[in-house]
């Protein structure tokens, strides 16, 4: 009786420990997801203008609606007249004013007033804007006081539409960060698609050979090598790509630089091969022997049996292997960062440098001020990556469940 009660006690204890650890893990994952999306969504309630600054114009200026990209072009002197911004009744050219060059526009008396009391800056800036009807100014918000009589432009908040449709990623731009993630999303999809197109034929061929054609000696040699490939750190693949693949691409295609989307796709294809080969091989080995023998008995040869029986029967498992390979490619960071050129521009071909979501987060998160628009935008990118990988995993679960139902 004592033995039974003791055994029951230890079983209950271990069961409780397992339940507790599972609960803690689940709660931690949920909290991480909540933190990720709460930090990300806070971007869309943030002002576009850099924190602590204001954009000012003459009080008679009719400008009302201006985008963040237009403001950047104004301060970069790419837009030089108010007509280009839709202010039809304003013939003035745009003059850019920053607080650093206040001495250029202020009189000696005004500079003395500022030196005596910094609170006089608002009055001086008002006078400068009054005398220069075409001026646009970026000044610290705390300099706008009761003496300021001109107009402040309200740029509004970051919008979801602009975030996903703009094609410029320049989060450190002043006075307004440029947070268009379209180039980064497209770079991620291009590299991942290229990787799967390269990895699928080689991975499927290797899995067919190992499952259907190889003898036991060759199989015992190949299996550990493939498993070893999956255990190599991604930075090692990155070094291999940087030393071997990048110079090769530069030489073959006569490019100014070899860091490109194609280099990233080749490296990711090599990294995805172990996943595709292993899962596809397991799926091919699950084909009932009776089906193969029936095919051979009807006069089909070995290759006809593989193409007409084995592959169609195991297509769900092969599809799951491909999708998991895509998931590996989408989430990879270091290897891609090393070989793609890390350029946040819209890719036109795989021979151009580009940037992916994981590489962007890894390269910029350490430099982004906590709580700023740049920091929050990186969390939005993390949320996008999470949703992409979640959808991939759900699709794999769906395919796997279909395969299990079919085998029953």
For each predicted feature, which ranges?
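Periplasmic/extracellular loop-to-transmembrane helix junction in inner-membrane transport proteins
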Residues: 2-16, 41-51, 67-70, 78-81, ...
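Membrane-interfacial helix termini and adjacent extracytoplasmic/periplasmic loops
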Residues: 11, 39-44, 159-179, 237-271, ...
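Cytoplasmic-entry segments and transmembrane alpha-helices of multi-pass inner-membrane transporters
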Residues: 14-16, 202-241, 408
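Flexible loop/hinge segments at secondary-structure junctions
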Residues: 47-165
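Transmembrane alpha-helices
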Residues: 279, 288, 302-338
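C-terminal transmembrane helix and the adjacent membrane-cytosol boundary/short C-terminal tail
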Residues: 281, 285, 289, 296, ...
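Interhelical loop and adjacent transmembrane-helix boundary motif
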Residues: 337-386
């Amino acid at each position: 009786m004592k033995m039974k009660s003791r055994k029951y006690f230890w079983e209950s204890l271990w069961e409780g420990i397992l339940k507790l650890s599972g609960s803690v893990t689940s709660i931690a994952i949920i909290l991480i997801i909540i933190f990720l999306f709460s930090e990300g969504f806070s971007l869309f309630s943030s002002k576009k203008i850099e924190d602590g600054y204001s954009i000012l114009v003459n009080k008679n200026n009719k400008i009302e609606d201006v985008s963040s990209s237009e403001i950047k072009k104004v301060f970069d002197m790419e837009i030089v007249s108010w007509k280009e911004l839709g202010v039809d009744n304003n013939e003035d050219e745009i003059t850019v004013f920053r607080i650093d060059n206040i001495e250029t526009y202020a009189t000696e008396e005004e500079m003395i007033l500022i030196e005596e009391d910094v609170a006089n800056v608002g009055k001086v800036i008002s006078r400068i804007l009054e005398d220069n009807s075409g001026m646009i100014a970026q000044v610290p918000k705390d300099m706008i006081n009761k003496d300021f009589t001109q107009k402040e432009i309200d740029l509004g908040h970051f919008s979801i539409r602009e975030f996903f449709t703009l094609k410029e990623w320049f989060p450190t731009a002043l006075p307004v960060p440029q947070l268009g993630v379209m180039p980064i999303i497209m770079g991620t999809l291009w590299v991942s698609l290229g990787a799967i197109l390269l990895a699928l034929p080689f991975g499927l061929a290797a899995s067919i050979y190992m499952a259907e054609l190889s003898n036991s000696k060759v199989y015992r040699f190949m299996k550990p090598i493939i498993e070893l490939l999956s255990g190599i750190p991604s930075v090692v693949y990155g070094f291999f790509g940087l030393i071997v693949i990048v110079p090769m691409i530069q030489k073959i295609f006569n490019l100014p630089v070899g860091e490109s989307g194609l280099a990233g796709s080749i490296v990711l294809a090599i990294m995805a091969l172990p996943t595709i080969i292993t899962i596809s091989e397991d799926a091919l080995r699950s084909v009932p022997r009776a089906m193969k023998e029936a095919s051979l008995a009807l006069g089909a040869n070995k290759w006809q049996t593989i193409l007409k029986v084995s592959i169609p029967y195991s297509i769900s498992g092969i599809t799951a292997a491909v999708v998991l390979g895509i998931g590996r490619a989408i989430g990879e960071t270091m290897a891609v960062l090393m070989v793609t050129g890390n350029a946040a521009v819209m890719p036109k071909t795989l021979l151009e440098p580009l940037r992916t979501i994981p590489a962007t987060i890894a390269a910029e998160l350490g430099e982004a001020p906590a709580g700023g628009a740049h920091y929050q935008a990186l969390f939005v990118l993390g949320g996008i990556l999470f949703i992409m990988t979640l959808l991939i995993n759900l699709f794999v679960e769906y395919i796997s469940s279909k395969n299990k139902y079919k085998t029953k």
